Amino acid sequence: MANRQKMSKTRDKKPDWQERVVQIRRVSKVVKGGKKLSFRAIVVIGNERGQVGVGIGKASDVINAVKKAAADGKKHVVEVPLTRSNSIPHPIDGIGGAARVIMRPSAEGTGVIAGGAVRTVLELAGVRNILAKQLGSNNPLNNARAAMNALSRLKTFSQFAKDRGVIAE
């Protein structure tokens, strides 16, 4: 029984999934005896083929915080529709806290023109040609959440046609 559980755990972790740490921050909690220090990690996980997730983890040491964040990221994976030129199908913007991210599709050969946490999210989602701008807050967590909010609301041409009751050719 224990051997089967080990095998299923190794099968879940596919080699094509990548994780990148966006931020590690030391945080403290004031308790009766003084300050209790812990670490908060923000990790982006993706397979570069249209699936990406952002996770947050807190622990008393950095390694466990990153592990928890990666596990949290796997729980919050979203599917991103990509075009033939590895861009997004249409312009969109997303909001996370006080951060706002505007994304626009771009032509082949443009590359990922974005900064900070948004760039990491887009690269691990598999987007190769895009223009993105961060507005408002420059907090990496809120910018990553804003990017995920935008990517989760993307639709393909056929999905728009289906929603409107039009037959797509």
Curated annotation (Swiss-Prot):
Gene3D superfamilies: 3.30.160.20, 3.30.230.10
GO molecular function ontology, one term from the record: rRNA binding
Signal peptide interval: none
Record keywords: Cyanelle, Plastid, Ribonucleoprotein, Ribosomal protein, RNA-binding, rRNA-binding
Keyword Secreted tagged: no
InterPro entries: Ribosomal_Su5_D2-typ_SF, Ribosomal_uS5, Ribosomal_uS5_bac-type, Ribosomal_uS5_C, Ribosomal_uS5_N, Ribosomal_uS5_N_CS, Ribsml_uS5_D2-typ_fold_subgr
GO biological process, one term: translation
Pfam families: Ribosomal_S5, Ribosomal_S5_C
Residue ranges of domain S5 DRBM in the record: 17-80
Gene Ontology CC annotation, any one: cyanelle
Location in or out of the cell: Plastid, Cyanelle
UniProt free text on domains: The N-terminal domain interacts with the head of the 30S subunit; the C-terminal domain interacts with the body and contacts protein S4. The interaction surface between S4 and S5 is involved in control of translational fidelity.
Record function comment: With S4 and S12 plays an important role in translational accuracy.
The family this protein is said to belong to: Belongs to the universal ribosomal protein uS5 family.
Quaternary structure annotation from Swiss-Prot or TrEMBL: Part of the 30S ribosomal subunit. Contacts protein S4.
Protein's UniProt name: Small ribosomal subunit protein uS5c
Organism: Cyanophora paradoxa
